[in-house]
């Protein structure tokens, strides 16, 4: 039987590295880089990325685990038992059966992980070859525990990509944006260049702003807000999110995965007994009414939107979409722009599909 030990690369636990004699575990809290609104311990992954010596794989993985992913579940396992190789698997214990029943969003997150992994390896002039789904694509209905990808070090050298420098700066920004600030004229072109490889594989980028099409932008704002409400008022999907909330700095540090609510504001609410999971399950509670108002303001204050579409919904296309999204987000960061993924309208649970199948096809 394989012996399993825990070695903390960063703070917490969410990427399992399988080695001949031990397992190594590390986690991205989903919190932004160090700042006054989050506990310092929760930012360890950003502060410690790339700090380990020795194996290039663990160094590259320390950046890959900062990848954006649904509900910050970080559903990845990296098997390092073969020298100079990473066998990348999906952790089937980390699933979102209510909001992501087919595992599409989680697989997109795995694509983000692979893109950051390659950027980090290339930064050290190490080229890698990535073979996806070596055992074949999983069912369109459910992911399995077969390898998502085999990553091998190549004999050639690689050139560093400027987007690597944005990995530690990128974050999903969940605050209202500045609607008065126009989208820089060069942005659509820069984002398209960032996902040039993905475009060759059938993916397309769309960008809309107040300058380019106010009607389409307004339609997308309404669509994202209405979809957020569907997920919120559907009891089982909202409960899935509430169960994954880490309320207060103590929970964020103890379990640095899931949806982080760690800041002095939430610490005070928790200490005063004004916020807890039971209360958050009541969608009509005063606190949740405030949350609705906050998210409506956030989504309606969106000066531009970007989307990625594929010619198929294959598992390979989903994985490549994640790689494209990671690059687009890093390219936006390089221009001083912030992004937040709002993909509720694409979720496959019945209530969402019934409400949005027609509308989302006509909008985009």
Region spans (language model):
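Acidic, surface-exposed loops and disordered segments
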Residues: 2-364
């Amino acid at each position: 039987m394989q012996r399993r030990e825990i070695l903390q690369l960063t703070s917490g636990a969410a990427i399992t590295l399988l080695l001949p004699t031990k397992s190594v575990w590390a986690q991205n809290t989903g919190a932004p880089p160090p700042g006054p609104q989050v506990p310092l311990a929760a930012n360890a992954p950003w502060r410690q990325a790339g700090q380990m010596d020795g194996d290039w794989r663990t160094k590259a993985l320390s950046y890959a685990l900062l990848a954006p992913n649904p509900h910050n579940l970080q559903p990845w396992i990296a098997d390092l038992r073969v020298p100079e190789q990473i066998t990348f698997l999906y952790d089937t214990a980390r699933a979102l059966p209510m909001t992501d029943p087919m595992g599409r969003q989680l697989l997109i997150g795995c694509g983000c992980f692979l893109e950051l992994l390659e950027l980090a390896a290339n930064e050290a002039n190490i080229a890698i070859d990535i073979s996806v789904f070596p055992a074949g694509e999983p069912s369109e209905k459910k992911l399995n525990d077969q390898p998502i990808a085999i990553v091998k070090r190549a004999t050639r050298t690689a050139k560093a990509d400027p987007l690597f420098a944005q990995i530690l700066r990128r974050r999903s920004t969940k605050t209202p944006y500045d609607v008065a600030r126009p989208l820089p004229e060069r942005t659509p072109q820069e984002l398209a260049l960032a996902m040039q490889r993905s475009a060759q594989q059938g993916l397309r980028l769309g960008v809309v702003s107040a300058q380019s099409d106010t009607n389409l932008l307004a339609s997308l704002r309404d669509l994202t807000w209405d979809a957020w409400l569907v997920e919120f008022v559907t009891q089982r999907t909202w409960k899935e999110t509430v169960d994954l909330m880490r309320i207060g700095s103590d929970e964020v540090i103890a379990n640095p995965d899931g949806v982080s609510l760690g800041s002095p504001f939430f610490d005070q609410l928790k200490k005063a007994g004004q916020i807890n999971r039971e209360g958050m399950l009541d969608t009509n509670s005063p606190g949740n009414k405030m949350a609705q108002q906050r998210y409506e303001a956030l989504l309606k204050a969106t000066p531009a939107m970007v989307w990625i579409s594929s010619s198929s919904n294959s598992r390979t296309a989903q994985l490549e979409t994640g790689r494209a999204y990671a690059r687009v987000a890093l390219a936006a960061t390089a221009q001083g722009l912030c992004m937040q993924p709002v993909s509720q309208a694409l979720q496959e649970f019945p209530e969402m599909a019934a409400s949005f199948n027609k509308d989302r096809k006509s909008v985009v």
